[in-house]
Design a protein with these regions (language model features):
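A generic fold-level signal
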Residues: 2-4, 13, 84-87, 110
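Short connector loops at helix/strand junctions that flank enzyme active sites
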Residues: 4, 25-27, 32, 85-89
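Short, hydrophobic/aromatic-rich beta-strand segments within well-structured domains
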Residues: 10, 19-21, 90-94
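The catalytic Nudix box helix
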Residues: 32-68
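Functional cleft and adjacent loop/helix regions within the main domain
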Residues: 33, 39, 79-81, 150-155
């Protein structure tokens, strides 16, 4: 299999802003909570697990509004991870039903160092590695019609 099956969570608060998280291993790199599916795991089960692991939200704190995918991207030439040459994400739009304060990215061994809420059109594609930019552009356009996406660097 070329692409690793994966899920990503676009968490939207009541005002319409979406949650983005800054990677712990790369300052200035922002993304949605995401992760690979384990063997035999369904996309919804993977989503619930990843949201709990990465931002500490239990299943009753959000509703699933929409899912689309897969959106694929390839790793740079010559790179494989866990035997895969890329990832295929199903993106879930989640509506936050609990207070925003429940979102927690500061647990020990956390994948993220911080989080913030932005309007979808404020997402700067330069926050991502080049391999992910096309997929994120499509996701944001498909989910939000965000046509004024920012990109401060070339790519």
């Amino acid at each position: 299999m070329l692409y690793r099956p994966a899920v990503a969570a676009i968490l939207q608060n009541r005002s319409g802003r979406i949650l983005i998280c800054e990677r712990a291993d790369a300052a200035g790199a922002w993304q949605f909570p995401q992760g690979g599916m384990e063997d035999g795991e369904t996309p919804i089960a993977a989503l619930i697990r990843e949201v709990l692991e990465e931002i500490s939200l239990p299943r009753n704190a959000y509703s699933i509004a929409w899912v689309r995918g897969p959106y694929r991207y390839r790793f740079p030439a010559g790179i494989t991870k866990k035997g895969f040459r890329g990832q295929a994400h199903h993106y879930f739009l989640l509506r936050l039903r609990a207070p925003k304060s429940l979102v927690n990215v500061g647990s020990p061994n956390a994948e993220f160092r911080s989080a913030r809420w932005i309007w979808p059109e404020e997402f700067d594609l330069a926050w991502l590695p080049p391999m992910k930019r096309r997929a994120y552009r499509r996701v944001l356009q498909d989910f939000f019609g965000a046509t004024a996406l920012i990109q401060t660097n070339s790519g």
